[in-house]
A protein has these predicted regions:
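Outer-membrane beta-barrel pore domains and translocons
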Residues: 35-39, 79-81, 117-121, 148-150, ...
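Long, well-ordered mid-to-C-terminal structural blocks that present hydrophobic/aromatic surfaces
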Residues: 11-87
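Residue-level signature of outer-membrane beta-barrel architecture
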Residues: 23-25, 66-69, 105-107, 120, ...
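Outer-membrane beta-barrel "beta-signal"
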Residues: 162-174
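Membrane-embedded beta-strand positions in outer-membrane beta-barrel channels/transporters
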Residues: 16-18, 60-64, 100-102, 130, ...
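Repeated loop/turn-to-beta-strand initiation elements of outer-membrane beta-barrel proteins
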Residues: 27-31, 71-76, 109-114, 140-145
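Outer-membrane beta-barrel translocator domains and adjoining extracellular loop/strand segments
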Residues: 1, 42-49, 86-92, 116-118, ...
């Protein structure tokens, strides 16, 4: 006997509402945003649930601060996603917390930029670390190189731990 599997993609309407703010406080920029999502589908481990997904609302927010120290542009954000009316069989954690850190500095009259951007998953101690260097050869012509370095055992970043990558880019703008 032959088993046939039919997959039918389905896209669900997702309603959301939110807002953002940004203000200066001394030498700092404080900013934030929040959104409430109505009707998002999350994967479930419950074999009795049709299609293996369950519909839940969730709240997503971030708070961040930007500043410059010793000519190093610095940005730090805390991000949280909280699933409402949580069910233990949902694959995602009820609260998913992430910190992002961006450090960048320009050299050679702002033609050379060194940058380090990191996502740090607080739930599973995984991370994505993205060092990058870019150089403006002339106006409109830029070269850059960087890495995507995944770290962790499991989770959003750790699942890609053996998939680090190096990339290069040549960009011409006119």
């Amino acid at each position: 006997s032959q088993l046939t599997l039919t997959v039918i993609p389905e896209h669900h309407l997702l309603k959301l509402g939110g807002g953002s703010f940004s203000t200066t406080l001394g030498g700092f920029v404080l900013r934030g945003e929040a959104a409430y999502y109505n009707g998002k589908y999350f994967r479930s481990t419950d074999p009795l649930i049709e299609d293996g997904v369950v519909e839940k609302d969730y709240f997503h927010y971030l708070i961040g601060v930007d500043s410059t120290f010793w000519n190093i542009k610095t940005s730090v954000q805390f991000i949280e996603q909280k699933i409402q009316d949580y069910d233990e069989q949902i694959v995602n954690d009820e609260n998913e917390d992430t910190v992002t850190i961006l450090l960048s500095r320009d050299f050679l009259r702002e033609t050379l930029r060194l940058e380090l951007f990191s996502y740090i998953g607080l739930n599973d101690n995984g991370a994505l670390i993205r060092p990058k260097i870019s150089y403006d050869l002339t106006d409109g012509f830029q070269i850059l190189a960087g890495f995507n370095i995944f770290n962790g055992e499991t989770g959003r970043f750790g699942q890609y731990d053996h998939n680090d990558m190096f990339y290069t880019k040549v960009k011409y703008s006119f």
